[in-house]
Each structure stands twice: as C-alpha cells, then as structure tokens.
C-alpha cells in the first residue's frame, strides 16, 4: 500500500521517500503566495497546483531520468506488496503525493489486467 503522510506529524523509517520540492518528485507548482518556496510556477489554488502536477507527472515520466528513476524505485517496492511512504508537508490536505499514489496504483492495476488477459 502507498501512504502519503506529513513529515511534521509522522515518521517512517522504511520504504520512505521524500517527495517535497527539494526532490526529483517535488511539485513545481505552488498556490502559496505569501512566502518563498522552491516552486517555479504559481497556481491559482491548491487544487490547481495538484491538477497541474498530474499533467507534469505524465510529461516527466520517461523523459526525465531522475524523476523516472524515483518513480520506478517506489513502484518496484509497491509492486512487491511492501508498504511505501511518501513524505510531504501537505497532508491531511490534498497533495501531489496523492497524484503519485493514484498513478502507481493505476499502473499496477493495468499490469494485473494485462497479465490476466495474456492467460486467456
């Protein structure tokens, strides 16, 4: 299972991946206007920033080595049934970690369906 958690509130020591802006998986979009962030682009609000990250994910995966490697490391652990922890600062608010989680869950489901289709 993939868990997205707030690093200010929880700590996990195994299969933990930091996904904040200082990492290859960080969201380059921010809704925050009153303080400095490492974000490159301004979004209207939190939902806009996360929706844009979903598109960004699709653009980066396969075209950016650091991004793709990080996603693949997470996915390989998740695929084996290991619990994986995505560490951010947003939770319990909506977070780009939710996008990462959804994309990886969809990928695994697609692979399982394809495997079953091959066996028919």
Question: What positions do the PLM features span?
Answer:
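Catalytic phosphate/metal-binding cores of nucleic-acid and nucleotide-processing enzymes, i.e., regions
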Residues: 1-120
């Amino acid at each position: 299972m993939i868990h997205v958690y707030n690093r200010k509130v929880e700590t996990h020591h195994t299969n933990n991946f930091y996904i904040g802006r200082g990492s290859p998986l960080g969201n380059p979009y921010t809704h925050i206007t009153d303080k400095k962030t490492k974000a490159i682009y301004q979004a209207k609000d939190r939902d806009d920033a996360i929706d844009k990250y979903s598109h960004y994910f699709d653009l980066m995966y396969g075209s950016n080595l650091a991004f793709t490697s990080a996603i693949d490391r997470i996915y390989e652990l998740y695929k084996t049934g290991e619990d994986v922890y995505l560490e951010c600062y947003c939770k319990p608010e909506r977070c780009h970690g939710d996008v990462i989680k959804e994309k990886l869950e969809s990928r695994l489901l697609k692979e399982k369906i394809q495997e079953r289709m091959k066996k028919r």
